[in-house]
Amino acid sequence: MKPHFRNPVERMYQDTFSDNFYNRPILSRRNTVWLCYEVKTKGPSRPPLDAKIFRGQVYSKLKYHPEMRFFHWFSKWRKLHRDQEYEVTWYISWSPCTKCTRDVATFLAEDPKVTLTIFVARLYYFWDPDYQEALRSLCQKRDGPRATMKIMNYDEFQHCWSKFVYSQRELFEPWNNLPKYYILLHIMLGEILRHSMDPPTFTSNFNNELWVRGRHETYLCYEVERLHNDTRVLLNQRRGFLCNQAPHKHGFLEGRHAELCFLDVIPFWKLDLHQDYRVTCFTSWSPCFSCAQEMAKFISNNKHVSLCIFAARIYDDQGRCQEGLRTLAKAGAEISIMTYSEFKHCWDTFVDHQGCPFQPWDGLEEHSQALSGRLRAILQNQGN
């Protein structure tokens, strides 16, 4: 008997959307994949030519997956419009499985006039190395057209609610922890796709001038090593960068600091309790008091993880922030100021430098020395 859901539909019920697009990273009993699509010709402000929904079962035959249903429909429709360039957008409850991911990459390679943007509510089998490699192959840009994959944020959920749900003019009501789950998934996807930072973003935010204005974001680059027989083994799959989520960014009312976003994602790494790990963070600002307290709690409760922090600048080194740094150091964290060596390492490791070597800015070493002195005074409780 063939699975149902063969033909596309135009809208879904509110409960169906909320249940299937719920973005908690680990979720069971969601075996139906919902794919909302929009097709339009390339160009600014072009309205969609078609917008409907395909459904399919996760464990059914590949041809019954909604991604394959879409391409079966689109291929027939495309024959009538062979010379036109199209932009396709998917909003999908699960990211495509490994086989669908490879077939999508093949389709796009064979039809360079089609671009695809995929917004996913959740990542399917994100811990599997074969799946990670398939996603990287789909999203790489260097040898031909590929897809762009992003995690659905509040704006995409709101768009789907308005476009594909029988909303009866009711406003979309986000569920609890939607912003937190988005941040977690965004970080995990960045790890998988090995996102890199733009050079201007790095040089602007990590510049270590003693007094800077307008640097309200905190960037945090991280890498993880497993300690074994007095040697360190770098875990390449546990490396990436993130920044704080400012209030109202992506439609979320509340913000979240970069350090807390980082602590949120560590449990999903499933680090072996019987192994010892070293986590190294390179931050544009040292942690604030609250973040330092939370990081201290984390390393106190996770004895198999040691924490090393290199900061480009010291955040508000007066009062409670000084106390927070001392608490963090007392808990066992190593806190240092970034020098030329760390800036170069971050440039080489986390920046899309296109082969250009790191160029230090004027005063880098002098600023590092001055900040190191201030940090030593703080940690020794000597003030300025």
Curated annotation (Swiss-Prot):
Repeat is among the record's keywords: yes
EC number(s) reported in the record: 3.5.4.38
List cofactor names only: Zn(2+)
Positions modified as Phosphothreonine? Answer: T32, T218
Subcellular location, principal:
cytoplasm
Site, Interaction with DNA: residue positions: N244
For this entry, the protein name equals DNA dC->dU-editing enzyme APOBEC-3G
The enzyme's first-digit EC class, named in words, is hydrolase
What keywords would UniProt list here? Antiviral defense, Cytoplasm, Hydrolase, Immunity, Innate immunity, Metal-binding, Nucleus, Phosphoprotein, Repeat, Zinc
| Gene that specifies this protein | APOBEC3G
Which residues are the active-site ones? E259
* Pfam families with a match to the protein in the record: NAD2
